[in-house]
UniProtKB/Swiss-Prot annotation, chain A:
This is Aspartate carbamoyltransferase catalytic subunit. The gene is pyrB. Catalyzes the condensation of carbamoyl phosphate and aspartate to form carbamoyl aspartate and inorganic phosphate, the committed step in the de novo pyrimidine nucleotide biosynthesis pathway. It comes from the Archaea. One of its GO terms (molecular function) is aspartate carbamoyltransferase activity. L-aspartate binds at residues 86, 168, 229. It is an enzyme of class 2 (transferase). One of its GO terms (cellular component) is cytoplasm. Its EC number is 2.1.3.2. Heterooligomer of catalytic and regulatory chains. Pathway: Pyrimidine metabolism; UMP biosynthesis via de novo pathway; (S)-dihydroorotate from bicarbonate: step 2/3. The keyword Transferase applies. HAMAP family: Asp_carb_tr. One of its GO terms (biological process) is glutamine metabolic process.
Curated annotation (Swiss-Prot), chain B:
Involved in allosteric regulation of aspartate carbamoyltransferase. Pfam families: PyrI, PyrI_C. GO terms for biological process: 'de novo' pyrimidine nucleobase biosynthetic process; pyrimidine nucleotide biosynthetic process. The keyword Cell cycle does not apply. Belongs to the PyrI family. NCBIfam families: ATCase_reg. This is Aspartate carbamoyltransferase regulatory chain. The lineage of its organism: Archaea, Methanobacteriati, Methanobacteriota, Thermococci, Thermococcales. Zn(2+) binds at residues 108, 113, 136, 139. The keyword RNA-binding does not apply. Contains catalytic and regulatory chains. Its cofactor is Zn(2+). It comes from Thermococcus kodakarensis (strain ATCC BAA-918 / JCM 12380 / KOD1) (Pyrococcus kodakaraensis (strain KOD1)). Keywords: Metal-binding, Pyrimidine biosynthesis, Zinc. GO terms for cellular component: aspartate carbamoyltransferase complex.
Length: 310, 152
């Protein structure tokens, strides 16, 4: 599969074969990294991280991934320290940055910004989140985490919990899971149900989808519970946010009827939707999930740069 | 009398037939024909039609529609047929078809879409024709017929 020069913008651009390929390369890199400590596939290559919006995990794990591949990193982590503040267009910023680097990772508050950046740039662009639209590398690392934990994705029953209306992570994860033979429980308050067009699309693609507000009723059936934060910043008005804030909390009480093998995931940051008492249980997979960000992003950087020889 | 002759024959111009009943005003707005210097328009509304039940017809004197303009009509009147008339004769006939991609006609209704903030031509992919559903090339949001009509 030739990935050199390819952009990673939306999970919608990926086939199942593409996804499986990235996961396989990530696994190989993780093994190599464990053996050798550091790699040098990307020696002499420069990654530019353009974060127009704050992030902890995504930016640091991309930077860590590039360093672990032997490359180096330039970039900024807030738009306020750049010429964007002087009114520079996104297109001009991208045309400038591509002169200094070999691959660009961008997070931007506007939907479609990464697609536009990819059209303007002659070097590969990887989307690290565009407004409420897509965050494809998160989806790939989520799939990688599930596959590592269970050895497979097919045959699993997966619950998505929390803000299914505004959460971009759950939208693209659900779309990617539709490639597999899974059952999905969509658990949310009425106000935050998954948009109908996505639910319809999942059903059309053959996924068994159950929508419910009842977390405790769904828990015994699940192999994976994917929890998301109810994001205040995505709500059009405060009143709607207050109505649903704190609707669910995953704690030991809630988990008492869960399968022994249930794994709880979360894209983080969390607020109060998973009680810290869950962290020490065998159910907690969310910090392992954070770790997966590095090999998956190493795979994407290495593939788009064309330095892995695959 | 044939239904499309209910209004006077035009010597030269464009006849847009099979517009859904009641949509003629929207059609002339989209085509920019409501301006005072836009030329003579002949309109028939709520005409019985075998194909549509009821339909509207707009005849535009002295103006030939380009393909890009026809695409604009396709969004509001997907069954429309366009006849170009010269010397009282139909010299060209097109069936309006919704293209796979729509560029530069429609604005994205998502205020946070990058296409509303940067110097970029709006682009949409047609997801379904019946009912009409488009997906913004940039923000990937889907828009339905009502939103399309509001943003034309």
């Amino acid at each position: 599969m030739d990935w050199k020069g390819r952009d990673v913008i939306s999970i919608r651009d990926f086939s199942k074969e593409d996804i499986e390929f990235v996961l396989k390369v990530a696994e190989r890199l993780e093994e190599e990294l464990n053996e050798k400590g550091s790699l040098d596939y990307a020696r002499g290559k420069i990654l530019a991280t353009l974060f127009f919006e704050p992030s902890t995990r995504t930016r640091l794990s991309f930077e860590s991934a590039m360093h672990r591949l032997g490359g180096s990193v330039i970039g900024f982590s807030s738009a306020s320290s750049t010429s964007v503040k002087k009114g520079e267009s996104l297109a001009d910023t991208i045309k400038t940055v591509e002169q200094y680097s070999d691959v660009i990772v961008i997070r931007h508050p506007m939907e479609g910004a990464a697609r536009l950046a990819a059209e303007v740039a002659g070097i590969p662009v990887i989307n690290a989140g565009d407004g409420s639209n897509q965050h494809p590398t998160q989806t790939l690392l989520d799939l990688y985490t599930i596959k590592k934990a269970f050895g497979k994705i097919d045959g699993l029953t997966i619950g998505l919990l929390g803000d299914l209306k505004y959460g971009r992570t759950v939208h693209s994860l659900a779309e990617a899971l539709a490639f597999y033979d899974v059952e999905l429980y969509l658990i949310s308050p009425e106000l935050l149900r998954m948009p109908k067009h996505i639910v319809d699309e999942l059903r059309e693609r053959g996924v068994k989808v159950y929508e419910t507000t009842d977390l405790e009723g769904a828990i015994p059936k699940l192999d994976v519970l994917y929890v998301t934060r109810i994001q205040r910043e995505r709500f059009p008005d405060e009143e709607e946010y207050l109505k649903v804030k704190g609707s669910y909390q995953v704690n030991l009480e809630v988990l008492k009827n869960a399968k022994e093998t249930l794994k709880v995931m979360h894209p983080l940051p969390r607020v109060d939707e998973i009680h810290p008492e869950v962290d020490k249980t065998k159910h907690a997979l969310y910090f392992r999930q954070v770790f997966s960000g590095v090999p998956v992003r190493m795979a994407l950087l290495g593939l788009t740069l064309g330095v892995l020889g695959v | 009398m044939p239904e499309n002759l209910k209004i006077e024959v035009i010597p030269e111009g464009t006849v847009i037939d099979h517009i859904p009943a009641g949509k003629w005003l929207k059609v002339i707005e989209i085509l920019g024909l409501t301006k005072p210097n836009g030329g003579t328009l002949l309109i028939a509304s709520n005409v019985p039609s075998k194909k549509l039940g009821r339909k509207d017809i707009v005849k535009v004197e002295g103006r030939y529609l380009s393909e890009e303009e026809v695409n604009k009509i396709a969004l509001i009147a997907p069954m429309a047929t366009v006849n170009i008339v010269k010397d009282y004769k139909i010299i060209e006939k097109f069936n309006v078809e919704i293209p796979d991609e729509i560029t530069g006609i429609l604005k994205c209704p998502n205020p946070n879409c990058v296409s509303n903030h940067e110097y970029v031509t709006p682009r949409f992919h047609v997801e379904s024709r019946e009912p009409l559903k488009l997906r913004c090339h940039y923000c990937e949001r889907t828009i339905n017929e009502d939103e399309i009509a509001q943003n034309l």
